[in-house]
Amino acid sequence: RQVQGGTHTIQVPIMPQGDWTLSSGSVVVLGPTDDGLPHSAGGNITIPANAKLVLQDTSLMIPEGANLTVQSYGDFEGEHSQLHGNVISHSDQFGDSPSSNLTVDGNVFWTSCQNDMMLYNLHVEGAIQLDNSCKVTINSGGTPSSWTIGVGAVFEIVNRLDVTVLDKGEPVQGATISVDGQSVVTDSGGMASKSVTALSIDSSGVTTTGLMQVQMSWGQITDLMGWDTSMSKQHTFVASTVQSGILTDWLELEKAWSPYPVSY
């Protein structure tokens, strides 16, 4: 047990046999097992106020009929990890870390919502349910299999396109990236980003964005791609150029950066 800033970080070599309630003020980290198999809980898991459970590069299984419950001011995060089971969340801290990346192979129910909730990289493979007035936004999330939305509740998935533009492997600053008519410009690193609301669900219905056309323009060079907004995406545009004129030395054109439009 280690003391870190007033909280306790606990290494748990063996999962409890039955229901497991974390101690308030503790941080429990479950990392990869020696044999690579998932951690297996013996019953319900409860994360009380001021406690935190983190999965790091691992999987956690809870029994059928059991739940992982995140109480108000409790926190549950996953870093490239999976939970096999259902989640009941009363907390706006669940999945709120930008470094979180968690797949829930089960259902998620948000209830007792006191604040709007912003989550990151949460992929729910089962159903979601939002209690009345709950507002949940997932940045870079996956579409759930089904949903139940209470009165005044809103569920949104905001996905992001990260684009890099390269000229013979070097970043291109000032290239225009247009997504459905809205434009951003690449920075000194040749990068630009655009976020869109891919899915919005409220008590009145569902709105999806679907496939969007993305255009890159730089000087005389243009290129197109399609973006399925149901998932975040990274893409590299190659905008290699060859200056017109008389060559006085060898010019090596690498296949990796083709084609090479001649600029005038």
Set out the residue ranges of the language-model regions:
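The right-handed parallel beta-helix/beta-solenoid scaffold, focusing on the short coil/turn
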Residues: 6-12, 18, 24-26, 31, ...
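A short, solvent-exposed loop/turn motif at the edges and junctions
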Residues: 61, 122, 200-250
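A short, amphipathic beta-strand motif
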Residues: 161-167, 261-264
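Short, ordered, surface-exposed loop/turn motifs in non-cytosolic proteins
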Residues: 168-183, 187-188
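Short, acidic Ser/Thr/Gly-rich low-complexity loop/linker segments typical of extracellular
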Residues: 181-209
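Compositionally biased low-complexity segments at domain edges in trafficked proteins
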Residues: 244-264
